[in-house]
Every structure is written in structure tokens, then in C-alpha cells.
Curated annotation (Swiss-Prot):
One of its GO terms (molecular function) is ATP binding. This is Probable tRNA sulfurtransferase. It holds the Pfam family ThiI_fer. It comes from Streptococcus pyogenes serotype M49 (strain NZ131). Residues 60-165 form the THUMP domain. InterPro entries: Rossmann-like_a/b/a_fold (IPR014729), ThiI_AANH (IPR020536), ThiI_fer (IPR054173), ThiI_N (IPR049961), THUMP_dom (IPR004114), THUMP_ThiI (IPR049962), tRNA_STrfase (IPR003720), tRNA_sulfurtransferase_ThiI (IPR050102).
Length: 404
């Protein structure tokens, strides 16, 4: 027998009361986005399950994709069949025969939500267990911790049989906690911050600053590839490329070297906040980790934050670098992040950046700039691209390989 579908059990969203169906529908949409590369798949949801019908598709890549989607508590490959006792008997016998090995223990666990069905749960357990003994007389039944628990569900629309339960990613469906702008440089930290924001249901749009010719097409492709990795956890992500060359040249020419990083980050924060307001986001997310680099001391954060009253979420702020690296490896972004392309935070980086910049000094140096004009021109020049889980071709990978 081949699996008919993957049955998805919902996570934290099961506690969301009146908003339950909104959460479930969002999870369904996210699953559809993530499974877009598999056109035969169909998805439907009810109040306590989402059903992913395979329609002949190999189940293993579908399971691997679903394991990453936030809002999924657990999933099981299942056999779906008509609610017929003879069909159930045959299916249970076939499944257990295929699983049998010497010394195997099992139990039947039946759940009946269709109370019009001819047998109750206890009767089904007895009947189906007896059917297994008919074809496997040496198998042993065991009620506590058996090797195989064969779950049989009798629901209104059909019967379902499964024996495997696979842990999901947990968390909340992406998009159920509002929208935020992720400042993604291309380094190790910001993709991890994005992953953790997605886990709490935040719908992120990626803001990436590009300064050609100082930053290369490879750096841009790298940031887009990192964004594509993040789509595996909740579906499509808008990638916003911000032209930043003019601003960085202005800062380089007019500001003291020690304040280059502080002023650069202040402009990035202003621009991200303007984009957030334009695109109706609620928060800004970044990959700052306290004390890791000069711009991430408390004094630096205070001087940079002063340009906005928008909440700033820093998911990795208390994590050690090794912890961040381990998480980056676990979510498969690390190998991309360490590709050697310059980004806007590393070009023009001073040898001795100010670790305790004074807000008053930063504001005084910024009097040399047309701040509103620079920000407005950057925001008006953004390029928005929708990044999807589906890779139509290997253009991004080929570009990066060619440039390395």
C-alpha cells in the first residue's frame, strides 16, 4: 500500500480560541506556498487537522518540507480508505505484515469521531488485533510502549491508518503575529534572527542594502539565497533591495572615521523604518548580538536606535557567537553566510570604530548631510522581488559559484 496523504496536527494555534480558524487558514496557505514545487499536492484543513493529499507524489520530500513549517506540531503519513470493516481488516493485515520482524510488539489504537460507524473503538481494537494475529500468529501484543502503535481513526469523511508520528517545528504559523522588516546583511546572525522571528509567527520582509560597485552581484545573490532558505519555514518572502551607494559615499567623505559605522547604521535604520511604514509593518528585526562588534554595544545601540520609535526585535541579542553558528548550521544558512562577499557593513569599515559613540556627536556630524533627501532617494529606488521556495533554475547558485 502507498500512503495517501500526510496528516498534519496543529501546534500552539490550537489554543487560540476565536482566532483559531484564522490561524489554521494561515497555516494552510503557508503549507501551500512551501509545497509549491510539488504541483500534484492538494491541501485542505479542518479544525484539528490539515490534510496534505499526495496524489501519487513521493511522501518523503513532502515530510521533509512539512517538518520545517512553523505551526506544525506533528505529522503522520497515513493511508486513507473508505469506512468499511473488510477494507480496514485487509489494510491492517497488509501494513503489519510489511512491518513484521521477529519479536515485534504492537497494539491497535482506534479513535472514532464518527459515532454512526457500526463498531465502537473497543470493538474495532479487538477485531483488528485479531485480524493481525490471523496473518502473524507469532506477533506479540503489548499495551505499554509497543514497537508499533497502529492508529486507526474513523472520521466523518473517511478512515485513516498510521503508525508513524514525526515531530514538527512547533511555533506559530508565519503571518499570524503581524509583519516586520528583517535587516539582512548576508552574515551569519541576521538569517538566524529571521528564523526565530518567523517561529513566533512574524511575517518578515527582508531589507538588504546594496552599494554597487563596492558590493558585487554575488553579494546580492547571496542575500537572496539566504532569503530563499528562510522561505522553507513559512512560504514566500518579499526581498527589498535598497540602493545605498550615495549614502555610503557621503558618509565616507564627510564624517569622522570613528563614526562611520554609527552613522551608516543610523541611516540604515531610518530607511528601514520608512520602508516599514510604507509597507505597513509593525516592527524591525535585526541580528544584533550584545557586545559582539563595535556597533552592538549598548552605547552604539542607543545612538542608532534614537532615529526611530519603532520597536526593534533582536532575537539573538543574548546568544553567544557559537550558539548562533550552531543554529545557522541547523537551519542550513551557515554555508551561504560564510561565502566571501563584501556587504554594506564591511566596506569602508574603520580600523577603530567608536564603541561608545555619543548621540550628540552623531547628530552634530549628521548636520553635514541632507538626511531627508538621502533617505527619500534610497526609499524611492528600492527593488522588490518575491522569493519563493521553488527554484526554477540554478541561476543564483551558478552566479555565486562563478564569482567565488
Amino acid at each position: 500500500m502507498d500512503y495517501s496523504e500526510i496528516m498534519v496536527r496543529h501546534g500552539e494555534l490550537s489554543t487560540k480560541g476565536k482566532n483559531r480558524m484564522r490561524f489554521i487558514n494561515k497555516l494552510k496557505n503557508n503549507i501551500q506556498d512551501v509545497l509549491a514545487p510539488f504541483p500534484a499536492i492538494t491541501v485542505r484543513s479542518d479544525r484539528d487537522r490539515t490534510h496534505v493529499s499526495l496524489n501519487g507524489t513521493d511522501y518523503q520530500p513532502i515530510v521533509e518540507a512539512l517538518k520545517l513549517v512553523f505551526g506544525v506540531q506533528a505529522l503522520s503519513p497515513v493511508y486513507k480508505l473508505e469506512k468499511s470493516v473488510p477494507l480496514l481488516v485487509t489494510a491492517v493485515q497488509d501494513i503489519m505484515t510489511s512491518l513484521y520482524r521477529d519479536g515485534l510488539t504492537f497494539k491497535i489504537a482506534t479513535k472514532r469521531s464518527d459515532h454512526a460507524f457500526e463498531l465502537d473503538s473497543r470493538e474495532l481494537n479487538s477485531l483488528l488485533g485479531g485480524a493481525v494475529f490471523e496473518v502473524l500468529p507469532n506477533i506479540q501484543a503489548q499495551m505499554k510502549h509497543p514497537d508499533v502503535t497502529l492508529k486507526v481513526e474513523i472520521r466523518d469523511e473517511a478512515a485513516y491508518i498510521s503508525y508513524e508520528e514525526i515531530k514538527g517545528a512547533g511555533g506559530l504559523p508565519v503571518g499570524t503575529s503581524g509583519k516586520g522588516m528583517l535587516m539582512l546583511s548576508g552574515g551569519i546572525d541576521s538569517p538566524v534572527a529571521g528564523y526565530l522571528a518567523l517561529k513566533r509567527g512574524l511575517d518578515i520582509e527582508v531589507v538588504h542594502f546594496a552599494s554597487p560597485p563596492y558590493t558585487s552581484p554575488g553579494a546580492l545573490a547571496k542575500a537572496q539565497n539566504l532569503t530563499r532558505r528562510l522561505t522553507r519555514f513559512g512560504g514566500n518572502i518579499q526581498f527589498i533591495e535598497v540602493p545605498f551607494t550615495e549614502i555610503q559615499e557621503e558618509i565616507k567623505n564627510k564624517a569622522p572615521e570613528a563614526y562611520l559605522m554609527t552613522l551608516t547604521r543610523r541611516f540604515m535604520m531610518r530607511i528601514t523604518d520608512a520602508i516599514r511604514e510604507q509597507r505597513k509593518g509593525l516592527v524591525i528585526v535585526n541580528g544584533e548580538s550584545l557586545g559582539q562588534v563595535a556597533s552592538q554595544t549598548l552605547e552604539s545601540m542607543q545612538a542608532i536606535n534614537a532615529v526611530t520609535s519603532t520597536p526593534i526585535i533582536r532575537p539573538v541579542v543574548t546568544m553567544d557567537k557559537l550558539e548562533i553558528i550552531e543554529m545557522a548550521q541547523a537551519i542550513d544558512t551557515f554555508d551561504i553566510s560564510i561565502q566571501p562577499f563584501e556587504d554594506c557593513c564591511t566596506i569602508f569599515a574603520p580600523d577603530r570604530p567608536k564603541t561608545n559613540p555619543k548621540l550628540g556627536n552623531a547628530e552634530k556630524y549628521e548636520e553635514r548631510f541632507d538626511i531627508d533627501g538621502l533617505v527619500q532617494r534610497a526609499v524611492s529606488g528600492i527593488v522588490v522581488t518575491e522569493i519563493t521556495p521553488e527554484i526554477v533554475n540554478d541561476e543564483v547558485e551558478n552566479l555565486i559559484d562563478a564569482l567565488l
